[in-house]
Amino acid sequence: MNNLFDKNEITILVTDSGLGGLSVAADLAARLPKSGIFEKARIIFFNALFHPGSGYNFLPSEEEKVRIFNIALQAMEEKYHPDIILIACNTLSVIYDQTPFAKKTKVPVLGIVETGVDLIAEQFDNNPDASAIIFATQTTIETNSHKNMLIKRGYEKEKIIGLPCSMLADYIEEGANSEMTTLVISEYVSQALEKTNKPSAPIFASLNCTHYGYSMEQFKAAFKDAGYPDIKIINPNPEMSNFLFNKKYINRYSETEINVDVVSKTKITEAKIASLGKLVEKISPQTAEATKNYKYDPDLFDAKFDSSRIGL
């Protein structure tokens, strides 16, 4: 990883199974220019969604998820020659190690799961009596990646509560602040609180799907309505790229010139661009503009996906 800092110019590829990881790309675009760590940095957001009528969490098996993501990873390396790949997606991070790509690539690849685990562990250390509620997709919860890593670090499994939030990422993409998204989040918060063993004990929450951070205010409001106005809610997204901002290399150059590109195999609807673009623009106007002018490439990668099974 230290070899990255020997480079004057760098290509950072951020990928996600949807558009949640745009916030990670935006954070990089916002922080890099003044850092002066590199002379030039190209940031590519690669949407790894393989079909507009499906998604990784709807695939019938883990093997199929691994197969398709592996094809996407190969395309990332072959088409963009990144110096590093950031998997800004918990669903894809938890299956990455199973891909053939992971076993042969020389490109450093970092997933967001460990970032989330570090932040949850930090909160446990600050409040040992608390329980953690992990909001994530079905795939992320089923693998128990966060929970198992925390247990290995010595934290009690009874204090780690996982809640799968089916379809929430899709609702957020359509409207992070919409009435439907707000209602769905409120329902999931209610379900999570019902799973706590000791209702009177302190709790904190962690948003372990990169989409969920877009609706942070809705989560806060839902917890407030449920009687937890001061709850700590963790969003790993802004922390994922911290490792790049090594103090040892800050101001190697007077500034870092950046370029941001967004590429997608599937079309991104105007509604999604409008919804998420406003939120991304608050972090990085350049990333919001790149999203608006994204490159639609139906041949970005060939997932060999049988769409007949979803009626298309």
Model-inferred region functions:
Residues 1-312:
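Non-catalytic structural scaffold of enzyme domains
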